[in-house]
Design a protein with these regions (language model features):
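N-terminal binding-site loop/beta-alpha segment at the start of enzyme catalytic domains
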Residues: 1-68, 126
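Acidic (Asp/Glu)-rich catalytic clusters
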Residues: 2-5, 34, 55-66, 86-95, ...
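Beta/alpha (TIM)-barrel catalytic core signal, keyed to glycine-rich beta->alpha loops juxtaposed to Asp/Glu
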Residues: 10, 105-277
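Acidic-and-aromatic substrate-binding clefts and catalytic sites of carbohydrate-active enzymes
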Residues: 17-23, 43-53, 74-81, 108-109, ...
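Short, acidic/polar
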Residues: 20-33, 78-93, 145-154, 223-228
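Hydrophobic residues in well-ordered beta-strands that form the structural core
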Residues: 42, 71, 189-191
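A short, structured active-site edge motif that brings together acidic residues
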Residues: 65-77, 99-103
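Active-site groove signature of glycoside hydrolases
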Residues: 89-115
Length: 277
């Protein structure tokens, strides 16, 4: 499965555009990420669409530095998937989406996953058409614990290059069998929610003490370094997507991504137990 080449860190844009009346700081962060040459991850729905506004402002300042992008695309119906792809390209001034993160909004039988596994259907045909038109270069499927087995099977379709999932020191959002298949088959995986600022939600906060102890044992200066090293330790993970609206935090991400050394086998074993607990 030949996926486009990623850098270890991908800039997540979810925090941009929260205050659309004043985007000066957001623009400074985007400019620095563009200068660094990292991939970007975004969605047309972030912050009621104002995230795309910030990105477009920055892109139009220097079109020569427009990054490669992973963009969320909802795939519940033919009109929806077509609209989201065409609209994202129009709003950001892009010729194509480099990697479409296909997010299923339809769990009923016959959805996109079923069509990819079963030999076709209108959604799979539309995805093929968008690729043939050059509007989508590659595509990955978003995993959840409920759909991960089916999604991994669907990657055998010629329309899919890999998967995305929430994956970090506290979380691995797929079944044990799906994760084993990802590793064994070499399916490229993009990790969402780096936890570069440490535990940020109720689920990961419940594991914060154990994470802090592992961070100390590994000799990492902070959670950003630990989680970039964790991603570098797992061959299946092609990049980890970490969001920030802080210039200092972005610099920390970029520093941590430079020659990130894999963690020890002992630490990795402890991380795996924490992920699945």
């Amino acid at each position: 499965m030949q996926m486009l080449a990623f850098m270890p860190y991908t800039f997540g844009s979810m925090s941009l555009g929260k205050n659309p009346a004043d985007v000066a700081q957001d623009l400074a962060v985007v400019r620095r990420a563009m200068e660094a040459g990292v991939w970007f991850h975004s969605s047309p729905t972030y912050n009621q669409g104002f995230t795309f506004m910030v990105l477009r402002f920055a892109f139009d300042e220097n079109r020569s530095q427009v990054p490669k992008m992973v963009i969320k695309v909802r795939d519940a119906s033919v009109p929806l998937i077509r609209f989201e792809v065409e609209d994202s390209c129009r709003r950001l001034g892009l010729d194509a989406i480099d990697v479409a993160q296909l997010v299923s909004m339809d769990q009923r039988p016959g959805n996109l996953l079923d069509q990819l596994r079963g030999g076709g259907g209108p959604l799979a045909d539309e995805l093929a058409s968008l690729r043939a038109r050059g509007l989508i270069r590659q595509a990955v499927l978003f995993l959840t614990p409920e759909n991960s087995d089916a999604a991994v099977e669907a990657t055998k379709s010629g329309l899919i290059e890999g998967v995305t999932l929430y994956w970090n020191a506290c979380q691995r959002d797929c079944s044990h069998t799906a994760w084993a298949a990802i590793r064994e088959q070499g399916i490229p995986a993009l990790a969402l929610r780096t936890l570069g600022g440490g535990p940020s939600d109720q689920f990961s906060s419940a594991k914060s003490e154990e994470l802090a102890e592992m961070l100390k044992t590994a000799g990492c200066r902070n959670a950003t370094e630990f989680n970039l090293r964790l991603a570098a330790s797992e061959p299946a993970i092609r990049t980890t997507i970490g969001g920030t609206a802080s210039l200092a935090h972005l610099e920390d991400y970029l520093k941590a991504a430079t020659n990130a050394a894999p963690l020890s086998a002992d630490i990795l074993q402890r991380v795996e137990q924490l992920q699945i607990r």
